[in-house]
Each structure stands twice: as structure tokens, then as C-alpha cells.
Amino acid sequence: MRKIWILLVKLSGWHFEIPDLKDRPELRHCVVAVAPHTAFADYIVGAAVLFAAGVRPKILVKKEFFNFFTRRLLLHLGLVPVDRGNRHNDLVEKAVEMLKNDDNVCIVITPEATRKPVKRFKRGFYEIATKAGVPIALGFMDFKRKHAGYGPTILELVPLHVEQQVQKQIVRQIVVLETATIQES
């Protein structure tokens, strides 16, 4: 099923930038912060990127996407329903447990926690990485070029204002991608 999923996403024109996990084993077991979050398709493409890298994703998405028709497929793809309306859902602890129970899993989070523009990222991705003792990898998607990937930068866990550091690095990465697109034109 996963190979079929990768094939379908690639047939739709997507190209993946995937790190060599032999050289970067830390990318096999990490928190992936993906931005910008623009559509539900982010999860579909993101799952294919991690499948292609040989990693099992656990992608946290709002529970409203799970219904009678989609639930089985989404769970098989590694999507995990999250009740965002319940502040006492122990989401950080559950994600940490997923990481501690499996050395070949990446927790994938969109730190904006919404598709709307935000000034600051939420801190959950940092708390999960810190408590699980895993690094944070940056993920990206460029819908204009149909280019997606993860892992070009690993952040050391620095407690002071880490969400702003991640946000700045993702913005820099997007600017580089947009500059490359302009130069190709």
C-alpha cells in the first residue's frame, strides 16, 4: 500500500528531497516540523515523502478528517487523529510515548496548528522532541514546484525561543526554494 501511495503522489508530479538515512540516522527517529501548512494535501504528500525515506510517519491531524469513509485509509497512512478542542488530551505525552516505543518513527507536526497565517508557532513540537530526547528536522512543501522533503537542517534542542528559531529556518528554506523557482523561469 505504501509503495502504491508513493507512486500515486509521484505520478501527480511531485519530486522528493530525501536525506540518505545511512549518513543521517537521526532523521529516522525525530520530530518533523513542516511548514507552511496550506492544505490537507500536506499530509498526503508528507506521508509519501516519509514512506519513500523508509520511515513510518505518525502525522498528527485534527480528528474532523476522520470519518466512516476515510478513517481506515488515514490510519494506514500514519495519520493520527487529534482532538484540538480538548486542552487536556495529553497529546504531548502520547506523542512522546509513540517515539519511545518505536525507533523507526517520525512524529510529523505543522507547528502553526492551522492553515491561517500565524505570527508564532505553537510549542508542542518542541516539547515532544525535548521529552522524547529526539532532534527536530525541518520539513517543507512547495506546491508551485511540487517539491517536498525533510531533513536539510537538524536543530539542537535549545530551550530559549526555539519556535522562533524553527520558524526563521523554515522561512529561509522557503525563500531559497522560491529563489530557485525564479531562477529556473
Regions found by a protein language model. Name each.
Residues M1-E17, I182-Q183:
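N-terminal membrane-anchoring alpha-helices
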Residues W14-Q173, I182:
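Soluble catalytic domains of membrane acyltransferases
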